[in-house]
Amino acid sequence: PISAQKDSRSIYLNTKDKGIEISPTFSGIFFEDINNSLDGGICAQLIQNFSFQQYMVPEAPAKEFSQADSIIFGWSVISKGDAKGKAITTNEKPLLENLPRYYDFDPNDRYNDELRYQQYSIRFDIENAGDGFGLAANGYGISEHGSERAGHYYSNNTQIPSIAVNRGISYDLSLYLQGADYDGRISIYLEDAQGKVNSETIVIENLKNSWTKHTATLKAERTADCRLAIVADKAGTFYLDFVTLMPEASELWMEGKAGPFRKDLMQALADLNPTFMRFPGGCASEGTNYFGQVFWKNSVGDVEQRIGFRNHWGYWTSQYVGFYEYLLMAESLGATPLPVLNNGVTCQFAGHQYVAPLDTEEDRKRFYDIFVKDALDFIEFCNGDTNTEWGALRAEMGHPEPFNLKYLGIGNENKGEAFWERFDIMYNAIKEKYPEIIIVSTAGSASDGKEFNDNYAQIDEKYPDTYVDEHYYKNDNWFYNNRDRYNADKVRGGQGIKYDRERPTRVFVGEFANNATNNAYASTLAEAAYYTSLEQNSDMVVMAAYAPLFCKKGFNKWNSNLIWFDNRGLWRTTNYYYMKLFSKAGNRAFAASNVMNGDQIDEHVYVSPTIDTESGEIYLKLVNSEAVEKSLEINLDNRNIYKVLMEYISSEDTTVKNQGAQNYYSSYPGIVNFNYNETITPQSVGFGPVKKNFNISIPGNSVCVIKLIPEE
């Protein structure tokens, strides 16, 4: 690790001349339900369309939904021998007599919102049971015969067994049944793609004439991709609803105590050491139409009463994971929550934009109830005493302590008079009741230009105490060439105004990524170089997050994502690994430091030195964007003795991607020799003790963190 003097560079670290304080919330994550990240992803519940709500939307046919009552999305009919019968979707037997209706939806929206309050179940009408008649839940998968574009759960490509079970692991089953004139038995079991039973068989009989919840445990006999079979053995009629299957606690994040989350995906997030978590969008929180917005009250309380919806990205969000679970998720990661609420303006880039009317007194009352009061109630849900309405619900759900919400986003990539008029109403109402809440505003969808300038003009005049959410998806050159974007002397946008540290306005880089090369290693080098400048300007940029966070293999709406996964495993991109390396940070930067090549600055080495003022540990984050190895002489201004640990990633080939070679995922038919290998992973080297000056080799095309640990 100690290099000879070849192609040498040097850096001087003045440990006495401290620079800015690093924002304690600087490095975070942004979770959005995009790329099928939630249901069938980070949510460990294994049954797709478990409440049978994915039904046709009249006047807006979408292939992500069943198009007829006999086509049950994500399920297949089982008909053995000479069995004859029907299984159809119906709303004649609602599971809940008093389904909460928190919102008086706008009757002028093009979608019939009344339908979203319908409670569907399955009615079995069996003429002849033969050797068995029933349904099988296929889970979250995609068929080799699916003809539609990748990324959509269409009814004709969800018909293969895709419930990934592991030998010896138990799975907790829950379902509701109601009899009519059925007096037979119902058998429930796991079976693989060859029809071979893969668990014990649970038998339910003597059905009651009212909804009854049944629970059981199924232990997998083999590791396989399965379906859940529910099979009747006699003629008659009965009803089925709300079928869920959850892996045992050992397979869940924190054994299920922090929500129904997949352990492997959550561990990947925990390893990033996020300081904040933004959720649930993004465009997902705006929606493409009125009902497609995220309404938080529809996502809390008992899971049976939650109302799913077709999200902005064109598929179903069940809300099995709702705002309460998001808050638990953030808390379990040690991350400050940053939820985003809509203000009555849906995505302004979608085909059908909705703007909540304010023309009449009735309009203004509806706007207050659905958007303004809703935001105030949400803050009460997060922070309120248990004797308040929404604080009591939080306690009832299992969290009597407040979540200590500090930040709240209003809108996403919005712009224009309609947005700012509604933003103003919500901003003033929140600040009047909860002045301590920091509101996150928006610079729009672009990193510069008219929209960016117009939004900042509104913020400068009326909302200078907000954090401004800036988004940009750019190429390698942009990230290399804009490292000075937030420097104190840099002019912001086209208004001739600087990022003024004397004003309270701060920047939240809520979404950024190099999307030109789709997670190729070259994108990592450019992003990491840029990220060093964000950290060195974190007196202005107080939060930053890559986006998107997750993508399910074969279901990508976006081509550059931090973590790729399937039903069994995951791939961490090199973009992920540089963020993991860079999450190791001190709490204060050094005064400006450069890597020198003689008396010239090396323009291809990017650096951010920080120090932990309590432990004295020094962190030198460094990117070498050239293919040549460099010997770096590190000069310290003190005589302390240090141990040295360098962690790094590097690659001669900058086109490499840690996404796996396969097009889809482990359960896709015909896949052989499937693996979760990652081509590039962090390496480490340590040595010492060192004092004053020492040399270390920096690999070509590398992202490094050099940690200096004081010796006692």
Where do the language-model regions lie?
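Extracellular and organelle-lumenal recognition/adhesion modules and their flexible linkers in secreted
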Residues: 3-318, 336, 353-369, 417, ...
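Aromatic/acidic polysaccharide-binding cleft in carbohydrate-active enzymes
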Residues: 25, 34, 344-348, 504-608, ...
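C-terminal beta-sandwich/jelly-roll accessory domains of carbohydrate-active enzymes
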Residues: 625-712
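An active-site-proximal structural segment forming one wall of the substrate-binding cleft
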Residues: 218-221, 225-227, 254-274, 319-333, ...
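Noncatalytic carbohydrate-binding groove/subsite architecture in carbohydrate-active enzymes
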Residues: 220, 228-237, 241, 385, ...
